Regions:
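Structural motif
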Residues: 59, 144, 169-171
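C-terminal regions of RecA-like/P-loop NTPase motor modules
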Residues: 108, 114-115, 125, 151-170, ...
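Residues immediately C-terminal
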Residues: 177-180, 247
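Proline-centered loop/turn at the N-terminus of a beta-strand
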Residues: 85, 208-210
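Conserved H-loop
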Residues: 91-93, 213-216
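Cytosolic-facing regulatory segments adjacent to core modules
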Residues: 42, 46-47, 78-166, 180, ...
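Walker B catalytic acidic pair
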Residues: 174
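The Walker A/P-loop phosphate-binding site
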Residues: 3-112, 132, 275
């Protein structure tokens, strides 16, 4: 388990207040960004979340192909480009897929889709550009773990990496792909999910870094017109354990388009109000990035 008292010993009120002011002075406590102004906040766009905050677990839910991984990659790249060290838990795809998805965002040819990269049907200029993009990816302070693992083992890895060199963001893609631990052998699946969420929440608090946890809904399995975290298996425990709950809903009218619109809903926000009306952003499928409608605020260079 994650012993809270081992990770976070008692502190005085003076020390807690000093930490609070330290976070306030550090961009209002934000230690990571989504890479999208509508979610990070800017002088032009009313922030929905204000970024990813230290010590908080954010659940990012949506259907398969709805942009969850692209959102996670956008946040990871934005954080890494700003100098923050990122741990990306790739439970669904191999490290090579993660690398190509990140590289696609740096390519200048159009469309730089992962499928085209895999096909190897590229011109000489495109290969040269891909090599340039690959060098940009290689320079990012980004760690990728694509090994099958349990929640406890992943958290132990994160703690070890953080003690070696502090992390700024931890990403899990995605929750339901964690393996069962021995302690879960006789537990119901919903109990296992609840314990895994608690482990990640404790990790965020102990390391005082934001943890972005992706949650997959069943395709077409939403029980309501607009899906919520309760449409995921074990959704009640997930909703309860998260500090923030963000839902991505693709706009059906742009389904299949190279750049489609996605509505972002904030169903739960620690210390703030939810955003039930939704905020539209763009899902650039080819580049595997999210950006604002005007395309101006993403920190990723295309």
């Amino acid at each position: 388990g994650l012993g809270a008292h081992e990770e976070a010993p008692l502190v005085t009120a003076r020390a807690a207040m000093a930490d609070a002011w330290g976070e306030f002075d550090d961009e209002t406590g934000r230690s990571a960004r989504y890479g999208v102004a509508a979610l990070d906040g800017s002088e032009f766009v009313q922030p929905v979340l204000g970024g990813l905050f230290a010590g908080q677990l954010t659940g990012l839910g949506g259907v398969p192909g709805g942009g969850k991984t692209a959102m996670a990659i956008t946040a990871a790249v934005a954080t890494a480009e700003a100098g923050g060290r990122v741990l990306f838990g790739a439970l669904e795809m191999p490290r090579t897929d993660v690398a190509w998805r990140i590289a696609a965002g740096y390519c200048r040819w159009s469309p730089p889709s992962v499928d085209r990269i895999r096909s190897r049907k590229l011109s000489g200029d495109e290969i040269a550009d891909l090599q340039r993009a690959s060098r940009a990816v290689a320079d990012l302070p980004l760690l990728i773990d694509d090994h099958p693992t349990t929640a406890d083992a992943f958290c132990a890895l994160a703690r070890a990496e953080h003690s070696r060199d502090p992390l700024s963001l931890v990403v899990v893609d995605y929750l339901h792909l964690f393996e069962r631990d021995a302690v879960d052998a006789k537990s119901r699946e919903d109990q296992v999910i609840r314990r895994q969420v608690y482990a990640l929440k404790t990790l965020a608090k102990a390391l005082r870094v934001p943890v972005l946890m992706l949650v997959q809904f069943n395709r077409g399995g939403a029980k309501s017109e607009r899906p919520t975290m309760f449409d995921a298996f074990g959704g009640s425990g997930i909703e309860q354990g998260c500090d923030n709950v963000v839902i991505l809903v693709p706009d059906a009218s742009t389904k299949g388009a190279g750049v489609g619109r996605v509505m972002v809903y904030v169903d739960k926000r620690r210390g703030g109000s939810p955003c039930e009306d939704g905020v539209p952003i763009l899902f650039d499928r080819a580049r595997q990035r999210m950006r604002d409608l005007d395309g101006a605020a993403s920190q990723v260079e295309y």
